[in-house]
Every structure is written in C-alpha cells, then in structure tokens.
C-alpha cells in the first residue's frame, strides 16, 4: 500500500521503517491526550537510564483548535506519529531523513530545511532542544532532544520525532483539504476519504467543546483527578511497597486532569491568572509521577549501565 495514495498507507510505511530500525511498534494510548508526548511510552520512558526505542500513532485532542469541520487543515482531533529513542543516536537526523524518503519525500528532490524551534510542554514540565522540519516551505514534522521531562533532567538525553500525519499526508497526496485525503487507497465507490471517517465527529466535538461541555462538571472532574493521582502515589510511598507506587494508574489521572483543563480552556471559563495556576497543578502531578517512576524497575531503579 503506497504511502502517497492513502492515509493508512502512510502510517503502515512509517511502522515498517521504524520497526526495521529497532523500534517496538506500540499501540495508541487509550486516554484523551493533547499530543503524542503524553503517551507514557514517551513521558515516563524518557526518564531514567534504561534504553528505550518505540514508535506509535497517537490520536491527539486539542479542543480549542476545533473549527466545526469548516477549516481545511485545522482540527480538534488529529493524529501524530511519535518516535522515541533513548539514548538519542548520533545519526537521528539521518534516520529521520530516511523516513521521509520511505514515504515518498526524497530529500534530494525537495527543499528540506531544519528550522530551530526549541520545544516546551508547560503542563508536563518538559522542554528540549528542537528543530522543525520544513519541506518546500511547509512544516511537516519536528524533532527534539529532551532535556527535561516532569521537571526531571533526562540522562541520557532521548531523541523524539513527531510527525503531523494529516499535514504530511496532505503534502504527499497533493490535496489542499484534509477531508479530501484518500484514507484507504481505493478509488470509485470503494474509496474512503478522511472526511468520510472524521468530518461528522469533528463537527460534533467542536460544538461540544465550545458550547455544550458542562463547566461545573469539568471543574469537579479536575479536582477528582488531581486528588486521585496524589492518593494513588501516596498509597505506595511507604513500607514494603516503596518500589511499587502504581505509577501508571496515577499518571492516567494526571492525563485526565490535563484534558479537562484543555476543555475548560476551550469553554472560555479560565482567566489568564487561573490558567497559570491550573498548568502548575498539572505540572506538579506530572513531577510526582516522574519521581515515582524513577523508583521502579521500569524507571531504572536497579539498572546498571555498562561498565558500572
């Protein structure tokens, strides 16, 4: 299935490429997240000394970006392709360029440029040195060398690649409207477009995000998620369970709090002053989850690097 002819073909090609380069091909995380970075396979696994190589597609939700399905390239629900390699290999840029060639963008035939654009996620307490990749004047992806995640220094540094799948697919298929993307690679009566799959949902979720979401309920959901996250971490913080803190269930609650915050922001009920307060509260949850993760085997608590 050729990547220039279908959205699903593009995804399958990236899966095959990164699998051939040693990445575990994971599944999307089953939570409402604002970006692929929120997947624990990136956020948590970027911490600690243990090597990690993974790639996956992640549905991402940004309620404020909805346009009722009327904008040709702006969506409240979209897909990112995420790659995380720790420690970051010295040839990360070459690997990335190889992936572009695999999906039909030969760097020798196109104007591929890297534009410095350091990345930051305030709610995750994360930042890194990064570059946007522009192809013939349009941004198609970003790669970042993580310096800090959950407020914790990344050692070793992890390399992250993020592809905006819809934008990339529009480019390789040569269409100007995301809803016109060929989704399944077929033609005629059997052809399925991106709009066939997602347009109605985009319209309905835009209405919900901007007009219908109950703000009092959302506020309570945020409080509940915050309390539950801290309670889960506290339950495993002492005694013989000190190395088993139920980090992943706690991190789920952190993700919930972040998404609820984004919904409240879309509804316009958070002032500028309150906004910073909510961000700090989510960041505090992320920090606690990251610190707890480092006390687990997956976080490298008993891991020894070669030569130690």
From Swiss-Prot:
PROSITE patterns: AA_TRNA_LIGASE_II_GLYAB. GO terms for biological process: glycyl-tRNA aminoacylation. One of its GO terms (molecular function) is ATP binding. It is found in: Cytoplasm. It holds the Pfam family tRNA-synt_2e. It catalyses: tRNA(Gly) + glycine + ATP = glycyl-tRNA(Gly) + AMP + diphosphate. Gene3D superfamilies: Bira Bifunctional Protein, Domain 2, Class II aaRS and biotin synthetases, domain 2. Its EC number is 6.1.1.14. Keywords: Aminoacyl-tRNA synthetase, ATP-binding, Cytoplasm, Ligase, Nucleotide-binding, Protein biosynthesis. GO terms for cellular component: cytosol. It is an enzyme of class 6 (ligase). InterPro entries: aa-tRNA-synth_II/BPL/LPL, Gly-tRNA-synth_heterodimer, Gly-tRNA_ligase_asu. Tetramer of two alpha and two beta subunits. NCBIfam families: glyQ, PRK09348.1. Belongs to the class-II aminoacyl-tRNA synthetase family. HAMAP family: Gly_tRNA_synth_alpha (MF_00254). This is Glycine--tRNA ligase alpha subunit.
């Amino acid at each position: 299935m050729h990547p220039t002819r279908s959205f699903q073909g593009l995804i399958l090609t990236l899966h095959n490429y990164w699998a051939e380069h040693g990445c575990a091909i994971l599944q999307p995380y089953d939570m409402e997240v604002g970006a692929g970075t929120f997947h624990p396979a990136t956020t948590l696994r970027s911490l600690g000394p243990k090597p990690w190589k993974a790639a996956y597609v992640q549905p991402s939700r940004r309620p404020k970006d909805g346009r009722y399905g009327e904008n040709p390239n702006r969506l409240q629900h979209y897909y990112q392709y995420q790659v995380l390699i720790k420690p970051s290999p010295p040839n990360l840029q070459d690997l990335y360029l190889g992936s572009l060639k695999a999906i039909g963008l030969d760097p020798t035939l196109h104007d591929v440029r890297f534009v410095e654009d350091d990345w930051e996620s305030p709610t995750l307490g994360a930042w890194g040195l990064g570059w946007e990749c522009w192809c013939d004047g349009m941004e198609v992806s970003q790669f970042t060398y993580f310096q800090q995640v959950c407020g914790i220094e990344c050692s070793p540094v992890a390399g992250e690649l993020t592809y905006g799948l819809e934008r990339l697919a529009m480019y390789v298929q040569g269409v100007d409207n995301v809803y016109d993307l060929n989704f399944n690679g077929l033609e005629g009566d059997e052809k399925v477009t991106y709009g066939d799959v997602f347009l109605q949902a985009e319209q309905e979720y835009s209405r919900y995000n901007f007009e219908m979401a109950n703000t009092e309920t959302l506020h309570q959901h945020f409080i509940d998620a915050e309390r539950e996250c801290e309670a889960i971490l506290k339950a495993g913080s002492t005694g013989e369970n000190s190395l088993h803190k139920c980090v992943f269930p706690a991190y789920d609650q952190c993700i919930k709090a972040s998404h609820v915050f984004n919904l409240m922001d879309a509804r316009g009920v958070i002032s500028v002053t309150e906004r910073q307060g909510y961000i700090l509260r989510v960041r505090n949850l992320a920090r606690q989850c990251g610190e707890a993760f480092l006390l687990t085997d997956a976080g490298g608590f008993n891991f020894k690097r070669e030569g130690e």
